[in-house]
Amino acid sequence: MASDAPTGGSLADRISNPAETTEPVADKAQLDGAASNQGGSDLAEPEYNVEVKLSDLQADPNNPLYSVKNFEDLGLDPRILQGLSAMNFRKPSKIQERALPLLMGNPPKNLVGQSQSGTGKTAAFVLNILSRLDLSSEQAQKTPQALILAPTRELARQIVGVIQVMGKFLDGLHIGTAVPADTNARPTRMEASVVVGTPGTVMDMIKKRIMVAAKLKVIVLDEADNMLDQQGLGDQCIRVKALLPRDIQVVLFSATFPAHVHQYASKFAPAANELTLQHEELTVEGIKQLYLDCASEEDKYRTLVQLYGLLTVGSSIIFVKTRASAVEIERRMVAEGHTVASLTGGIEGSQRDQIIDQFRAGHAKVLITTNVLARGIDVSTVSMVINYDIPELHQPPNRPRQADFQTYLHRIGRTGRFGRVGVSISFVSNREEWEMLNQIQKYFNTDIQRIDTKDWDEVEDIIKKTIKNTRAQAGFR
């Protein structure tokens, strides 16, 4: 029966014969930022350094002018400072310390930044945009002055949410969205000071003169590496930019900078100041990583069902490889009386919005998804991520399977948004999957602890203790 406890796996024993343990491995000490009521920003940041490379090679990037320790030092509109306070931001995160002076200088300069989700980069580019808006007249308020391009409607909607909170005290701020929708639902004219959208829809609206681009001052391309991973989106962004004023400030953020992304960034944002995180920050510290041996694909499902009670302690995301898997797992679990939802790229846009909203509000505790959610979506209540299928790169049929390290990082980062800690559990059912897990351990120089499923009560006890311990280390109450 599907609800039976899964069989005890011993795949790792057979392959590498590791020493067994049922005690959670102690997390490395976390260097959390101060809580908001103690003058911090609720950003529990790991130690990392932000490196700056200026387009003006004669300038000193370590000059104090290129760093800021307090939002008040930026000369912001008091109403924007009120918005920051509403977000519990008391001081800049490390990336904001360096990014904000570069973004907000005059005359405006282009910026290319490397930053993962969860470091405060969205707030940084939104702050720059709000500080540059002219809201002095109704006509100005309803004329697009800033454009943000995102790879998915989910990320676009989340960015809109950040703008709404940060700009809630700005009279006359109008925010528009340009995402795939029923053509009949589109406005005949985009009347907004800030527009957030996906590249194809934005390009279509500009070409059809629904959106006027003549007054745009800033364009932001978020998640550039994710854009380039999706067929055609990178080219669409270039075509959108070609329709904009030549003197527009160009801001590009990307979580990773392999050669093709760096080349693209140089083309999209020429003569830009550059901001990068040193490699130490691009780690998975702060997230307790576990794995479970499963005897087969069917055993994966039985393991998932057995975990259901733990998944609903907070909110959980289950990542699978294909849309078909997400739909089938949802069907089986719902048939067995479990409350779950699935989210894939195949679901119509407004329905996807509804699913995300229900999950964010806590009405749905368990979400099954493909990589639609792996980047950029901030659901702060997520305490556990399940890698039902280990993420892997697309390889030719004759090549060995290769783990996708960046997707793994972004997946499990759902539990560690803004430095919060959480738990990730990967399922391993064959030698190839175990080898991909081992690749991940070596790449991130981290230990992923094996949990023996022979005694399921003990498995639950270990995971509960792990969740409790990681929350305690983060200062949760």
UniProtKB/Swiss-Prot annotation:
<feature type="short sequence motif" description="Q motif">
    <location>
        <begin position="69"/>
        <end position="97"/>
    </location>
</feature>
<dbReference type="GO" id="GO:0005634">
    <property type="term" value="C:nucleus"/>
</dbReference>
<protein>
    <recommendedName>
        <fullName>ATP-dependent RNA helicase dbp5</fullName>
        <ecNumber>3.6.4.13</ecNumber>
    </recommendedName>
</protein>
<dbReference type="InterPro" id="IPR027417">
    <property type="entry name" value="P-loop_NTPase"/>
</dbReference>
<feature type="binding site">
    <location>
        <begin position="115"/>
        <end position="122"/>
    </location>
    <ligand>
        <name>ATP</name>
    </ligand>
</feature>
<keyword id="KW-0694">RNA-binding</keyword>
<feature type="domain" description="Helicase C-terminal">
    <location>
        <begin position="303"/>
        <end position="459"/>
    </location>
</feature>
<dbReference type="GO" id="GO:0016973">
    <property type="term" value="P:poly(A)+ mRNA export from nucleus"/>
</dbReference>
<dbReference type="GO" id="GO:0003729">
    <property type="term" value="F:mRNA binding"/>
</dbReference>
<dbReference type="GO" id="GO:0005934">
    <property type="term" value="C:cellular bud tip"/>
</dbReference>
<dbReference type="GO" id="GO:0000822">
    <property type="term" value="F:inositol hexakisphosphate binding"/>
</dbReference>
<keyword id="KW-0509">mRNA transport</keyword>
<dbReference type="GO" id="GO:0005524">
    <property type="term" value="F:ATP binding"/>
</dbReference>
<dbReference type="GO" id="GO:0006415">
    <property type="term" value="P:translational termination"/>
</dbReference>
<keyword id="KW-0963">Cytoplasm</keyword>
<keyword id="KW-0813">Transport</keyword>
<dbReference type="GO" id="GO:0015031">
    <property type="term" value="P:protein transport"/>
</dbReference>
<feature type="region of interest" description="Disordered">
    <location>
        <begin position="1"/>
        <end position="43"/>
    </location>
</feature>
<feature type="short sequence motif" description="DEAD box">
    <location>
        <begin position="222"/>
        <end position="225"/>
    </location>
</feature>
<dbReference type="Pfam" id="PF00271">
    <property type="entry name" value="Helicase_C"/>
</dbReference>
<dbReference type="Pfam" id="PF00270">
    <property type="entry name" value="DEAD"/>
</dbReference>
<dbReference type="InterPro" id="IPR014001">
    <property type="entry name" value="Helicase_ATP-bd"/>
</dbReference>
<comment type="function">
    <text>ATP-dependent RNA helicase associated with the nuclear pore complex and essential for mRNA export from the nucleus. May participate in a terminal step of mRNA export through the removal of proteins that accompany mRNA through the nucleopore complex. May also be involved in early transcription.</text>
</comment>
<keyword id="KW-0547">Nucleotide-binding</keyword>
<dbReference type="InterPro" id="IPR001650">
    <property type="entry name" value="Helicase_C-like"/>
</dbReference>
<keyword id="KW-0811">Translocation</keyword>
<dbReference type="InterPro" id="IPR000629">
    <property type="entry name" value="RNA-helicase_DEAD-box_CS"/>
</dbReference>
<dbReference type="GO" id="GO:0006409">
    <property type="term" value="P:tRNA export from nucleus"/>
</dbReference>
<keyword id="KW-0347">Helicase</keyword>
<dbReference type="GO" id="GO:0003724">
    <property type="term" value="F:RNA helicase activity"/>
</dbReference>
<keyword id="KW-0067">ATP-binding</keyword>
<dbReference type="GO" id="GO:0010494">
    <property type="term" value="C:cytoplasmic stress granule"/>
</dbReference>
<dbReference type="GO" id="GO:0044614">
    <property type="term" value="C:nuclear pore cytoplasmic filaments"/>
</dbReference>
<comment type="subunit">
    <text>Associates with the nuclear pore complex.</text>
</comment>
<comment type="similarity">
    <text>Belongs to the DEAD box helicase family. DDX19/DBP5 subfamily.</text>
</comment>
<keyword id="KW-0378">Hydrolase</keyword>
<feature type="domain" description="Helicase ATP-binding">
    <location>
        <begin position="102"/>
        <end position="275"/>
    </location>
</feature>
<keyword id="KW-0539">Nucleus</keyword>
<keyword id="KW-0653">Protein transport</keyword>
<dbReference type="GO" id="GO:0016887">
    <property type="term" value="F:ATP hydrolysis activity"/>
</dbReference>
<dbReference type="InterPro" id="IPR011545">
    <property type="entry name" value="DEAD/DEAH_box_helicase_dom"/>
</dbReference>
<dbReference type="GO" id="GO:0031965">
    <property type="term" value="C:nuclear membrane"/>
</dbReference>
